Amino acid sequence: MNAWEVNFDGLVGLTHHYAGLSFGNEASTRHRFQVSNPRLAAKQGLLKMKKLAGAGFPQAVIPPHERPFIPVLRQLGFSGSDEQVLEKVARQAPHWLSSVSSASPMWVANAATIAPSADTLDGKVHLTVANLNNKFHRSLEAPVTESLLKAIFNDEEKFSVHSALPQVALLGDEGAANHNRLGGHYGEPGMQIFVYGREEGNDTRPSRYPARQTREASEAVARLNQVNPQQVIFAQQNPDVIDQGVFHNDVIAVSNRQVLFCHQQAFARQSQLLANLRARVNGFMAIEVPATQVSVSDAVSTYLFNSQLLSRDDGSMVLVLPQECREHAGVWRYLNELLAADNPISELKVFDLRESMANGGGPACLRLRVVLTEEERRAVNPAVMMNDTLFNALNDWVDRYYRDRLTAADLADPQLLREGREALDTLTQLLDLGSVYPFQREGGGNG
């Protein structure tokens, strides 16, 4: 059956700022307290969506979350009106204000794990929301992510959206950023690789930085998504690269159809994994980047593997990269050698995503891949599908509501909260989503 990969990109939120909230993510830590530009961040992401859609790659958008998120501050003991809550937390515990204002939902590779209908026992597309419980600011995302996905994939005959796993460390789940799918054409059954960093009773784990994904979580997600057990491989990420800042597998590997593009040190027992894939995936091709050509450190600083590998109709592939790859002489030299070599990659597309990159999120972080048949694609909420009309509407929306300068101190401004709610209220109408945000359900919005 014919099917396509649709990339659902996260729209950067109005409170995009640099707070260094993500231990283990070296870019996040390095850019802590810098002044951010939310308007530019959103426009950089939108431009990527527009250009890829214009090049013939199906593209859609997932909206940002409500931030600052006042309900959590109330859970933490701050009381009064919304404005009073903001004032109290800014004065008494400003670190909480930064956490509940994070624009991290823009990295929708962590929103959920997807199983296309060709891989599932019931023939539906399954989406399991990630609990993201390794980081407080990200653990807040799951309920609204679930509401958004249910508003986008709202045909229950074709889509099943599952709630996140219980919020405990044993079941730490980071979504599609730790998941790859390999196979032939998108509509054919594929092999799903669930990548984890730790498991109970296994001493092979990182020592410097946390392993956010557990094998126990990966197994549970595979069950929830009803993936055919014959089409699942569980693979451990190399703990040494986690300790070098590879906090998700999509920082060290990316797959598309029959190709796995990865660093030679990406996985524990890598040669064994690749042999398994060669035996189980027709035409499997591993493009392993040697450490002698690109070190793990350079891969992390340029986000070489946090790229998108996209298929053209003729079977050739395009590698979508951040600007940082072009600016690194060694990485750019390797990429040009890759283009000349015998593999399906025939074009490099480079995007300036500096605002997101400075918080540790490249092209792959910003997108959630969903393989859909034509019938399934028609069942998706059409208002979120990217085209010139939607791009222009969203670009105007960003110009109207987003600030071009934001510091941590600005997060306490009650006007920022009001601007954000008004913006999201308008956006839910633009994208035909209904009332998906808590402030709307409490009677504060018109969505």
UniProtKB/Swiss-Prot annotation:
EC number: 3.5.3.23
Coiled coil: none
Enzyme class, UniProt record, top EC level: hydrolase
Protein name per the record: N-succinylarginine dihydrolase
Role description: Catalyzes the hydrolysis of N(2)-succinylarginine into N(2)-succinylornithine, ammonia and CO(2).
Chain positions recorded as substrate binding sites: 19-28, 110, 137-138, 212, 250, 359
Catalyses which reaction(s): N(2)-succinyl-L-arginine + 2 H2O + 2 H(+) = N(2)-succinyl-L-ornithine + 2 NH4(+) + CO2
UniProt keyword annotations, A-Z: Arginine metabolism, Hydrolase
Subunit comment: Homodimer.
